[in-house]
Amino acid sequence: MPGASAGTSTSESIDAPPEKPLYQMRPVEAGRYIAWAHEHEPDLRKRIAAIARKNIGQPYQLNLLGEFPYQVHDELPMFSLDHSDCTVFVEHTYAMALSTSWDEFFWMLQRIRYRDGIIGVATRNHYTELDWNAANGWLVTDVSAQLAGPDAASYMMTVDRATFLKTRHRTEAAIPVETSRQAYVPKARVVALAGQMQEGDYVNVVSLLADGKTMVTHVGLVVLGPDGERHFLHSSDPAVREETFAAFIARAEAREEGKRLAGKKSSTLLGFKFLRLNDNIVVPPMAPQPRPS
C-alpha cells in the first residue's frame, strides 16, 4: 500500500502484552497494547486497574501537558507516555481503558481533558472539583457525601478562572467567578469506608493549604489488593506507586510533622473525595472545535 510503513500500525494484533512497562513504550507499541487490553479484559474496572499497574514506576514530573502545537502559549505537548503527574496519570489511564486503538485513545484523552472536548487552555479542566469532576460527569459521579453520611465534612471553594488564565497562561477569557461547597470524607474515616469503593473509582485528596485555602491537591485511582483491600494507585514524586490508604495517610502525616519540626509551612491532609466510576458509560461526542479568532 503506498505510503505505508511496515511495523508501524497501531492496529496490529499481538499475542501477549509487552513485558516492558507502559511508560517505556513508543506510541505504536502503546496502541497495540491498548487494543490487546481491550480484547483480553472485557471488564472496564479490571482493565483500568491493569493499565494503571502497567505504569507503576513511571517517573513523576509536574506540569507536563499543554496544547502545543495547537496553541503556542507554551511548548508542552498534548500527551505523555514516559512521565506523569497525578492528573496526567489518571487521564491517560481512563482514556486508554475506554479505547481500542491509539487514535481512539488520543481522541478520548482530549474528551476527558477539555470541557466538551474543545481543545484550548481556556477550556482545559484545570480545577479538579469545579472543572474536571463537573465536565466528566459522564465518567464518574461524586459519592463523597453519600459515603460519609453524617460524618461528611465540607469546604467552600471559590474559583477565579479569568485571573488564573491571565496570570498563569497569558490568556484573556471572560469567565465569571464560581463558588461551590464540596463534601469530602475526613481522613479518620477513610480506611473504614474505603471498602465501599470499587476498582477503577476516582480519588481526590483534600488538603488545607498553608494559605488557608482548602482544595483537592492530588488525585489517583482505587484498585483492589490481593486480599481485596482497597489500594490507592497514583503518580507522586518520585514515581507511580500502589499503596494502602492507611500507608498514604501515614506518609502524609509524617511529611507534615517533619516540616513542622523544621519550621516550614506545610499543607495538611484533611480527607478524600471519592467518585464512583459510572456503570454503562456512554461517551458524549466532542463539541465542534471553534475557529480560532
Regions found by a protein language model. Give the residues of each.
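Catalytic-site beta-strand/loop segments enriched in glycine and acidic/polar residues
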Residues: 52, 56-72, 175-216
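Charged/polar, solvent-exposed surface patches and flexible loops
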Residues: 32-36, 50-54, 92, 107-111, ...
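Low-complexity, Gly/Ser/Thr/Pro-rich intrinsically disordered linker/tail segments
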Residues: 12, 21, 193-208, 216-217, ...
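Acidic/His-rich structured neighborhood in mature extracellular/periplasmic domains
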Residues: 60-182, 198, 228, 234
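Domain-scale selection of a single, long terminal region
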Residues: 2-6
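Cationic-aromatic interfacial patches
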Residues: 7-87
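Long hydrophobic alpha-helices with heptad-repeat/coiled-coil character
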Residues: 147-150, 156-194, 262-293
